[in-house]
């Protein structure tokens, strides 16, 4: 199993997703590999939203705030909090969905914002 996964990983790095998509059937593992190892456009993710793994996409793909908003019920907020670049306005809008430990550790926050959300900030990171 490990060798097969390693081979797939190398293939994903070497060929574009359009070449892979031409196959009639893709396994869950194939879709996971595509989501993890290929840079996907939001258009591609939108087109195959029912096939992709949203946990992997939320962690490994670069998503715009508008796209995250559009798919707010699909994205994995834990990874959005730490792996996406978020504006303070976006963080305010979705403060109840976000993981504040990762917001505190990975987002670039102004002093005013930190004061405003001092009760949410994880001071131990």
Question: What is the predicted function of each stretch?
Answer:
Residues 1-125:
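Alpha-helical scaffold segments
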């Amino acid at each position: 199993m490990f060798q097969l996964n390693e081979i797939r990983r190398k293939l994903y790095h070497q060929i574009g997703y359009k070449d892979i998509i031409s196959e009639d059937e893709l396994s869950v593992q194939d879709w996971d590999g595509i989501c993890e190892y290929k840079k996907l456009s939001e258009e591609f993710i939108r087109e195959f939203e029912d096939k992709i793994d949203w946990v992997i996409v939320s962690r490994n793909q670069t998503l715009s705030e508008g796209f995250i908003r559009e798919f707010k019920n699909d994205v994995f907020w834990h990874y959005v909090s730490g792996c996406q670049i978020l504006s303070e306005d976006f963080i305010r809008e979705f403060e109840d969905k976000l993981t504040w430990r990762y917001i505190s550790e990975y987002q670039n926050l102004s002093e005013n914002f930190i004061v405003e959300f001092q009760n949410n900030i994880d001071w131990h990171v």
